Curated annotation (Swiss-Prot):
Reaction(s) the record says it catalyses: Hydrolysis of proteins to small peptides in the presence of ATP and magnesium. alpha-casein is the usual test substrate. In the absence of ATP, only oligopeptides shorter than five residues are hydrolyzed (such as succinyl-Leu-Tyr-|-NHMec, and Leu-Tyr-Leu-|-Tyr-Trp, in which cleavage of the -Tyr-|-Leu- and -Tyr-|-Trp bonds also occurs)
Any single GO BP term: protein quality control for misfolded or incompletely synthesized proteins
Catalytic site: 98 (nucleophile), 123
Taxonomic classification: Bacteria, Bacillati, Bacillota, Clostridia, Peptostreptococcales
Family statement: Belongs to the peptidase S14 family.
The protein's assembly and partners: Fourteen ClpP subunits assemble into 2 heptameric rings which stack back to back to give a disk-like structure with a central cavity, resembling the structure of eukaryotic proteasomes.
SUPFAM superfamilies: ClpP/crotonase
Organism annotation: Alkaliphilus metalliredigens (strain QYMF)
Identification of the protein by name: ATP-dependent Clp protease proteolytic subunit
Pfam families reported in the protein's UniProt record: CLP_protease
Length: 194
């Protein structure tokens, strides 16, 4: 069981306690600090929709420290980030790998950041299937189509030519924060709010 810190606030009605993530949500901050799967995607999508309903004109920040995960779950988050009215700023703390890196790049242009010692890793989709030959062929075609879709979006988000994105995502491609900026995945490396 994960330990979640509690924050206590004084209000006119007494003390109020929040888990740290609920308190951050009040400040329009979402933390993606786990593998991306259907559960984390549902929670993140719900938080994005809630914050849009609260104030459709105020930016939302997503802090990312994720090894990546499910493509379909990640695309649910990506589509929602683009669907809602507020700009979504993304900040990499630690590591944004695979779908985590994709979501980092999906932030609003000019509002994608990484801390100085953060790392970013992109690669092609991973897949594995068992079964009859025809089923394996169907899954292989699907994963190639997903790879092409992800690469096309990375081209749009980074400004890199398709050939470079295809080459770089063929295997694990690691970048330090400054390299992720040069690549176009983020817009700035930030070290302080001062």
């Amino acid at each position: 069981m994960a330990l979640v810190p509690v924050v206590v606030e004084q209000t006119s009605r007494g003390e109020r306690s929040y888990d740290i993530f609920s308190r951050l949500l009040k400040e329009r901050i979402i933390f993606l600090g786990d593998e991306i799967n259907d559960v984390t995607a549902s929670l993140l999508v719900a938080q994005l929709l809630f914050l849009e309903a609260e104030d459709p004109d105020k930016d939302i920040q997503i802090y990312i420290n994720s090894p990546g995960g499910s493509i379909t779950a990640g695309m649910a988050i990506y589509d929602t980030m683009n669907y809602i009215k507020p700009d979504v700023s993304t900040i990499c703390v630690g590591m944004a790998a695979s779908m985590g890196a994709f979501l980092l790049a999906a932030g609003a242009k000019g509002k994608r950041f990484a801390l100085p010692n953060a790392e970013v890793m992109i690669h092609q989709p991973l897949g594995g299937t068992r079964g009859q030959a025809e089923d394996i062929r169907i899954h292989a075609e699907r994963i190639v189509k997903l790879r092409d879709t992800l690469n096309k979006i990375l081209v749009e988000r980074t400004g890199q030519p398709l050939e470079r994105v295809q080459k770089d995502t063929d295997r694990d491609f690691f970048m330090e924060a400054k390299e992720a900026k040069e690549y176009g995945i983020i817009d700035e490396v930030i070290s302080s709010r001062k």
